[in-house]
């Protein structure tokens, strides 16, 4: 009996140990799973940190001559500065220079762990300039480079444009080797073909030069190809500023687009002319207001050479009407100098009467170089709100001043709240002005 009970006790003890071992095994298995999951979370977190660091690094940087360039990265992400011939000038975990004194572009390559290139960063160093804020309503006459296709329609039940590849927004520049500069030239050239196929050279929206052919259709006494075209555009806006050293100027802060295609108009030439303000249509929620004006019987103030997404650029020839002086010149602020809070806009709402009005800079999108919505602004001046309801069409280009410097220009109004809108940085306007090929543009417009 003693032996039996001893055996029973041993058996129970072994069973308890087995249970304990099984429990320990389960706990170890659970612990390993927890460790594995934590490891995965940590790895994903590290990847997320690296992705965020690379993503938030801007693809392009605009800075003023003499400013400090600081681009810091985390461990494992290196920056290489390349020379004009592609040679590596500097490679480090950060690019820190006391001052960048040379105007031009710096090309930086972002590498991961010294081998995998993940991003390019372009640094454009622009000159520090003084400009004369204008804020005057002016007229603009733009003449297209070629004729702009704005629509298509059947001719006698036929579609000569079908399968030609031409789309709305394209520009026709030649027909049968004859240069096309305006709608009259296109009409005459097509009419002279006698119904024979014509070879058309056109420029697509992405600036690719292409050729195609169409067979005109006779309708009445004329031949037509079923394309609606336009060769000019006109409107009223605000002249932002000019550089007193060379009389180069910018207006609008945004580009002029075609009314039918909503695409930026590629111009061959243009004119800045005087405008006569007729009335102010007050803006309200859901319905933007407008400065109503005319450019009839106007005289030329200057020439337009470039229409870009960031404004209309040209040169001034007659400054008397602007009612400004070179003594009014101010520095263009870098975006780093701009602060949220009070600022002023300068605009003309009555003929010959320019005035400053108080606004608020609500938000600054400091890394935004891709469009003309650099700052969110709000009209706070009660007099301006009483006159216009806020920002209205025709005020685009009104210069914005803060702490004695030009910081930008008005570009957009928020439809649901006309007291709010967007503005573009002044340094972007200077950068765009510097990037215009003035020699080529002037030659093309002559």
Stretches found by the model and what they are:
Residues 1-70, 239, 418-426, 433-446:
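Gram-positive cell-envelope targeting signals
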Residues 32-39, 87-131, 309-358:
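Interdomain regulatory linker/hinge segments that flank or connect interaction modules
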